[in-house]
């Protein structure tokens, strides 16, 4: 594939967006979000059709395989009181051994090594935490928790009692209903600090309708982590590195994909996290999908040939983000920006609680399709 030199520049993935187009609330029911359907290559304009997510079932075939991400968002945001006075927030990310956890802190400049923090809740005994060190790679803080919260299972109990679901910073509100609405209906494996948002559109009714049509379903796990909060800062994308995220692709997923290929079905990823999980596992297998459990830091951008994924249901992503690069790898950068302009013109809602885009396998660049 011959790339336009601009494809390797971060500034080429910018686009103007009115803040009013950023969805602050989810729609109900889930499947009533709008759906931009990308026209197959070679078709006459327009470049897209407009529908609702409920209509997506008309685009799928019996024998297709949907790959969902079953991660569950932790209540990973903690509000703490600083010993010197004032409040702060911690976003708990990952273990750092012996009861220590890497956290993003706000305001970070007031969270210094040695500072004591107090975690408080109505009717609960305060819990003492301590900032141990700064983490230069992430910009976060390593925080010491009490020894009886040393492992993930124990910490999850603490987060459930004291924490809140960490909505993205562009959602300027908080409501108790987000604890349920910012989860997919099939979220079952706790570990993420952000939702795999394409899956938020899949209601129980839509999943049942797809099943009745003969569409198959399998689930991978990718715990969305620090990378989702970190903007891409490298203008030269040939040197881009991403923070790794924990992935598990089980044997039953491999078997489901093989069976899908055998019946000439299509592998459809629900969300970019499912793409990264499948493609990361295939990379570990030398280009062939295999079971996998471990960190994945795969960069997918224009020029990438997919090994597993044929089509994609995805949300609309932030300008100059790694997710925008991934979707550009499927349809081409200029074409994707034209599709985003179409969505903006037609008043689509953007980002986590926003609307969706369907990229049919016939809309994927030929050079990017699995061999």
Swiss-Prot record:
Kindly tell me the pathway this chain contributes to.
tRNA modification; tRNA-queuosine biosynthesis
Pfam families, alphabetized:
Queuosine_synth
NCBIfam families hit by this protein: PRK00147.1, queA
Q: Where in the cell is it found?
A: Cytoplasm
Quaternary assembly: Monomer.
Query: What class does this enzyme belong to in the EC scheme?
Result: transferase
Gene coding for it = queA
Sorted alphabetically, which InterPro entries does this protein's record hold?
Answer: QueA (IPR003699), QueA_dom1 (IPR042118), QueA_dom2 (IPR042119), QueA_sf (IPR036100)
Q: Record's Gene Ontology CC terms?
A: cytoplasm
Q: Which reaction does it catalyse?
A: 7-aminomethyl-7-carbaguanosine(34) in tRNA + S-adenosyl-L-methionine = epoxyqueuosine(34) in tRNA + adenine + L-methionine + 2 H(+)
Q: Write the record's keywords in alphabetical order, separated by commas.
A: Cytoplasm, Queuosine biosynthesis, S-adenosyl-L-methionine, Transferase
Quick one: a GO biological-process term for this protein? Answer: tRNA wobble guanine modification
The family line of this record is: Belongs to the QueA family.
Q: What does this protein do?
A: Transfers and isomerizes the ribose moiety from AdoMet to the 7-aminomethyl group of 7-deazaguanine (preQ1-tRNA) to give epoxyqueuosine (oQ-tRNA).
Return the SUPFAM superfamilies for the record: QueA-like (SSF111337)
Spell out the molecular function terms from Gene Ontology: S-adenosylmethionine:tRNA ribosyltransferase-isomerase activity
Q: Which positions carry the signal peptide feature in this UniProt record?
A: none
Name the species this protein comes from.
Prochlorococcus marinus (strain MIT 9313)
Tell me the Gene3D superfamilies matching this sequence.
QueA-like
Entry EC number(s): 2.4.99.17
What is the designated name of this protein?
A: S-adenosylmethionine:tRNA ribosyltransferase-isomerase
């Amino acid at each position: 594939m011959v790339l336009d030199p601009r494809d390797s520049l971060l500034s080429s993935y910018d686009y103007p967006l009115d803040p009013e187009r950023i969805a602050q609330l989810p729609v109900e029911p889930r499947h009533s979000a709008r759906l931009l359907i990308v026209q197959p290559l070679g078709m006459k304009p327009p470049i897209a059709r407009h529908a609702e997510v409920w209509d997506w079932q008309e685009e799928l075939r019996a024998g297709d395989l949907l790959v969902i991400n079953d991660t569950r968002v932790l209540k990973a945001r903690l509000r703490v009181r600083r010993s010197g006075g004032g409040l702060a927030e911690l976003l708990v990310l990952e273990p750092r051994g012996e009861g220590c956890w890497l956290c993003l802190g706000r305001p970070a400049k007031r969270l210094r090594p040695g500072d004591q923090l107090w975690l408080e809740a109505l009717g609960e005994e305060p819990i003492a935490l301590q900032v141990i060190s700064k983490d230069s790679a992430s910009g976060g803080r390593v925080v010491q928790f009490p020894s009886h919260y040393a492992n993930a299972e124990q910490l999850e109990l603490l987060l459930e009692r004291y924490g809140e679901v960490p909505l993205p910073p562009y959602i300027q509100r908080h409501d108790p209903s987000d604890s349920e609405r910012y989860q997919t209906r099939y979220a079952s494996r706790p570990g993420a600090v952000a939702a795999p948002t394409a899956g938020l559109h899949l209601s129980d009714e839509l999943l049942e309708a797809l099943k009745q049509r003969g569409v198959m379903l399998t689930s991978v796990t990718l715990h969305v982590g620090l990378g989702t909060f970190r903007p891409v800062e490298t203008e030269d994308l040939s040197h881009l590195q991403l923070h790794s995220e924990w992935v598990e692709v089980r044997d039953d997923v491999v078997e489901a994909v093989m069976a899908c290929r055998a019946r000439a079905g299509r592998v459809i990823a629900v969300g970019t996290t499912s793409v990264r999980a499948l493609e990361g596992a295939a990379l570990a297998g030398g280009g062939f999908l295999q079971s996998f459990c471990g960190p994945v830091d795969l960069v997918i951008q224009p020029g990438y040939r997919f090994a597993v994924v044929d089509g994609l249901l995805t949300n609309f992503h932030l300008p100059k983000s790694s997710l925008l690069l991934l979707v550009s790898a499927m349809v081409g950068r200029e074409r994707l920006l034209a599709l985003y302009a179409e969505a903006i013109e037609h008043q689509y809602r953007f980002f986590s609680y926003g609307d969706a885009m369907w990229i049919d396998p016939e809309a994927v660049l030929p050079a990017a399709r699995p061999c």
